[in-house]
Amino acid sequence: MWGVSSLDYDDDEELTRLLAVWDDEPLSLFLMNTFLLHQEGFRNLPFTVLRLSYAYRIFAKMLRAHGTPVAEDFMTRVAALARDEGLRDILGQRHAAEASRAEIAEALERVAERCDDRHGGSDDYVWLSRLLDLAPNYRQVELFQLLEKESRGQSRNSVWHLLRMDTVSATKFYEAFVSGCLPGAAAADGSGGGGSHYTGSRAGVSPGIQFGIKHEGLVKTLVECYVMHGREPVRDGLGLLIDPTSGLLGASMDLCFGVLKQGSGRTLLVEPCARVYEIKCRYKYLRKKEDPFVQNVLRRHDAAAVASLLQSHPVPGVEFRGERETPSAREFLLSHDAALFRATLKRARPLKPPEPLREYLADLLYLNKAECSEVIVFDAKHLNDDNSDGDATITINASLGLAAGDAAGGGADHHLRGSPGDSPPPIPFEDENTPELLGRLNVYEVARFSLPAFVNPRHQYYFQMLIQQYVLSQYYIKKHPDPERIDFRDLPTVYLVSAIFREREESELGCELLAGGRVFHCDHIPLLLIVTPVVFDPQFTRHAVSTVLDRWSRDLSRKTNLPIWVPNSANEYVVSSVPRPVSP
């Protein structure tokens, strides 16, 4: 279904059985069982290879326990490395005092055959870890790319859930950084592990989250057609991208552009200037079309109307703060524009920023306050309407779907729109040319304009996007032919998309929705998108990443009594993220 050999998330019984395999031997227990008696040289084994060895072991146990092959491409590639004669020779020479080459080869063959190792076979994974450490770096990166491929489908994919167990994911990073809560470092006895993580992974039961799941596909199409103007995104989505430099950080992304699935293995290639769009559907703003604030947006379609809509909720979607004031962490958008948003100011003094963030918050606010959001207002109507109400004539763009009048030529920021030549001219609607549009509700652009709102670097979503950008950047850096000459402008960028919908009126009930040439069966109609660019400070990213990696490695070392080494490539990220000095 998603191009992976994994089980459907909807099969609760099967997924529960697979998670039970992980619960039976969590990462910490695997490390103690495997390496406590082989600590000589363990300090030199990076966590990246330990993570790969553990993933292979869990998938092999799944096959033996349930007879279901999981992550077969990954398993096949690791088995091929285990049988690599060159790597076996090097391993035998380096560890001749511990075992003969024949003994090492026999152990690695048992691993490749996925044999039952309950009878003293844990040493096999010592040799597998050492062998993976000898493999070229690009081979290790390819294995992490295969894990991403095997986890596509995200919450519907069992591999995605399993990999998240031992990952500080983008959604967990904020708590790991601010409060030191480390969900990936499971207890050594396995308690409190699988159940709690599994519940968190399946938290899509609230109305707001269900609303986002149902409408995410439509929002992706709107971004593709009206923000990126037809640029091809990653089709069928991405799985869990695990940072190949640490093996610990991970990110699951909603929508990516400039990332290709290449070769027969369909692994990822990150191109220069890739873009990530993090989508947030604002369930709390779902209103009827006759709501006065919705009508105000559709009639006036300007920043003041949108600001009024955002302020109509008891907890406004944009928080106003003065230039020198500290924001709260309640909402993910901020504004310094008193004329539009001063009414959102609360007299209660906000809490102080958490200690790890306090030193950097002013700089992060300074970097982001110069950015401006772009608002795109939408409406939908039947194409056989006579437009007698004075609405703009609807035209159809040959590649992008629908537009209203010349709204597509409005005053949008160039960095969000692309060059003027990206889109072909609109084609007038004719019944005989487009019969498939009749009887459907067709989404079209009403207007677009700027909104003085920027991202709140104190909110947890900022940290979620920070890790998305960091992990994707590491894949770009690792695959770059000349990393020392990377242009910082070629690294991935991130945008936050806030999507607001309205309810259908009576005449719209039961009609299919058409957007970007695709049919959707959504219960609601898109009202507007707010697209906000996000700016990161490489120095702060290094600080945040280093803090979490250090905490996690110390915590797991304490629980396992092993010297866990989690590599940290944040310095290399900083070098690639800042302009190079001008040559004299």
Curated annotation (Swiss-Prot):
The primary location reported for this protein is: host cell
Function statement: Plays a role in processing non linear or branched viral DNA intermediates in order to promote the production of mature packaged unit-length linear progeny viral DNA molecules. Exhibits endonuclease and exonuclease activities and accepts both double-stranded and single-stranded DNA as substrate. Exonuclease digestion of DNA is in the 5'-> 3' direction and the products are 5'-monophosphate nucleosides. Additionally, forms a recombinase with the major DNA-binding protein, which displays strand exchange activity.
Residues annotated as region Disordered?
A: 409-429
Lineage of the source organism?
Viruses, Duplodnaviria, Heunggongvirae, Peploviricota, Herviviricetes
Q: What is this protein called?
A: Alkaline nuclease
How this chain assembles, per its entry, is: Interacts with major DNA-binding protein; this interaction increases the nuclease processivity of the alkaline exonuclease.
- Which Pfam families does the protein's record reference? Viral_alk_exo (PF01771)
Spell out the GO cellular component terms annotated for this protein, sorted alphabetically and separated by semicolons. host cell cytoplasm; host cell nucleus
Could you list this entry's UniProt keywords, alphabetically sorted. Endonuclease, Exonuclease, Host cytoplasm, Host nucleus, Host-virus interaction, Hydrolase, Nuclease
Q: Give the source's domain of life in one word.
A: Viruses
Cellular compartment(s) = Host nucleus; Host cytoplasm
Give the matching InterPro entries.
Herpes_alk_exo, Restrct_endonuc-II-like, Viral_alk_exo
- Per the UniProt entry, the Enzyme Commission number(s) are 3.1.-.-
Which residues does the annotation list for site: Required for function?
E216, D254, E278, K280
Family membership, please give it. Answer: Belongs to the herpesviridae alkaline nuclease family.
Residues in the signal sequence: none
Q: Name a GO molecular-function annotation.
A: DNA exonuclease activity
* Residues in coiled coil: none
